[in-house]
Design a protein with these regions (language model features):
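Core subunits and conserved enzymes of cellular information-processing
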Residues: 1-129
């Protein structure tokens, strides 16, 4: 599961460093749910299934008017060697105004705001600034 996400994060990071508008990533359910969260929160312009190769997804990166990437940093928080889990009570203590966190829950990938709304705990995967 996470190998696909790591590949997608690297693709997005490298694409933004190279100032690309479109990058291509693997089309997996976990990757599509991650892209849906990024799109709903305004971190990417959009995504679509590649017309040339249906097993890939085209990701449209978003930049400010000055050309600065909207996503300044993507970091993995929970790693295979060090698992971190938060209960629903611990999630309420996190400050969601400064950073954006995506959690892996028993209901799939959810943003920190969705976890607070649904009162669900989980494993924090990604921190986006």
């Amino acid at each position: 599961m996470k190998n696909y996400l790591w590949n997608m994060f690297t693709t997005i990071k490298n694409g933004q460093m190279a100032k690309k508008r479109v990058v291509i990533g693997p089309r997996k359910n976990i990757c599509e749910s991650f892209l849906k969260i990024l799109w709903n929160e305004g971190f990417i312009s959009g995504y679509r299934i590649s017309s040339q190769n249906p097993s890939n997804v085209e990701i449209f990166l978003k930049y400010t008017r000055t050309g600065v990437p909207v996503i300044s940093s993507l970091k993995f928080l929970s790693k295979p060697s060090q698992r971190i889990h938060y209960s629903s009570k611990q999630i309420w203590k996190l400050d969601s105004s400064k950073t954006f966190v995506i959690f892996s829950t028993n209901q799939g990938l959810k943003s920190i705001n969705e976890c607070k709304k649904d009162r669900v705990g989980g494993e924090p995967l990604i921190i986006i600034n």
